[in-house]
Amino acid sequence: MSTLGLAAAGAANAAVSSPSRPATIGTTLSTTSQAGYEASGRDFRYISSTLTVPDTDFLTEIYPQEYIQLSNGSLGGGDQYVRAGIESCTVAQSFGYSSCPTGDWTSFVEAFNNSLSGPYFSHYSLLSGVSQGDGVNFSIYYNESGNELHFVVTPPSTSGPTQYYKTQAYGAIFPYASAQDDFTDSTGTPIPVPFFLHAFRINQFLQGAITTEHGLRGSFVGPWTTSQIDATSNGLPYPSGTVRVSPSNLWSDGLSANGAVRPYDAFGVWAR
């Protein structure tokens, strides 16, 4: 492990007077179908980012879902998670959003609790008029005292108004926060990422912001452990597995998020 000399302070709608510890970069997490960054080592209540519409019109039989997430298991592997992001209408149709035209993109929000037999809350909003590379801002806020989850989706002005959603949280605790791509088939089922002939950028995550349960703020790094997520040929770390999709290094886009401009708040996801 290595540490970055960064500090994060503050909160979503709250101030913090004590200093926070430096950010920590954790061991890379290897999968067959996911790529991005995951924060762990704290309980989290807020995550936001601007996600760009994927540059993947030429892909067939593979559909990237991109989203921000709070969960009680690494890589969404626990029994509770909440997500907000972008997916293709082809995938959304398989979940009942029949008015989503094939070839277009939609925003979505989703809350999952295994004890409630799967996703208990979901909403879609067609991203009409967007082009590849256009940004859509998403935020998820967990109001623990009110036992509520709040979602905000802000598309480009040409694609409609800001969307607000709220649902119950059912006493959730979220020790993981991530921003990632998840590669699926047309039904939304995760599938191994195939071999690509040429490297290309799939999409970007900008203006990343995370807040812990106790109000410590950061970007994609902060007073927690941040781990890179790679999709490899067999789910094993390189060199045992060949990296097929991975995020770029974290960089700074200079844009304000959650009340401040912070370093290391952006990355791209690349087919390798």
For every predicted segment, state its role.
Residues 1-15:
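Secretory targeting and sorting signals
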Residues 15-272:
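Exposed, interaction-prone regions of secreted/extracellular proteins
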